[in-house]
């Protein structure tokens, strides 16, 4: 039986992009947290998870969640929800395109999950999103596609990628406030670094191993500052 369960996307899973290959790092934040906090973590995050996919994973593991020793359940979603089908945009930039989860869907499903976890006596804890690097990410998504068409759809503004990602991140903070639950601010820890891009992989969206160390430090600081008892 694990102490704490965590659910989310590839960032939470600990996926890094190295030498054009995605892999799960053994130095991911959850492994670091196990060492520095002295707890066992059941990492149920999954590559590509949107909030809707995450909902299905959480309900599939509801008994595991009930059995974990801690009252806390950690969630981190949004990075895939705000993403688009870049191939479709590349092929037809004049068409209207939609992100994988609309803002409305994202808020509604996340709120539902928070309520359902509270019903079984758990306290949801949200992680905010690490920022992305628009330049790196644009190069990554446009590889083997029509970069000019993608940029046309963005109205010539690569910074749209960062802005749209942050739009969802803001909703994560609002969800925590509106539902009176804890949020661990990962975002600010990255933004404190003058060139936080050095904490990201070459795809511009996944934290590298240095980035995962920063995430673990943010979690540790949050717990120590508030004198939180993880177990009991």
What is each model feature region?
Residues 1-47, 62-67, 73:
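Serine-esterase "nucleophile elbow" of acetyl-processing enzymes
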Residues 49-59:
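Structural motif
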Residues 59-209, 213-232:
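Alpha-helical cap/lid subdomain in secreted, periplasmic
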Residues 16, 55, 195:
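A short local structural element in Rossmann-fold oxidoreductases
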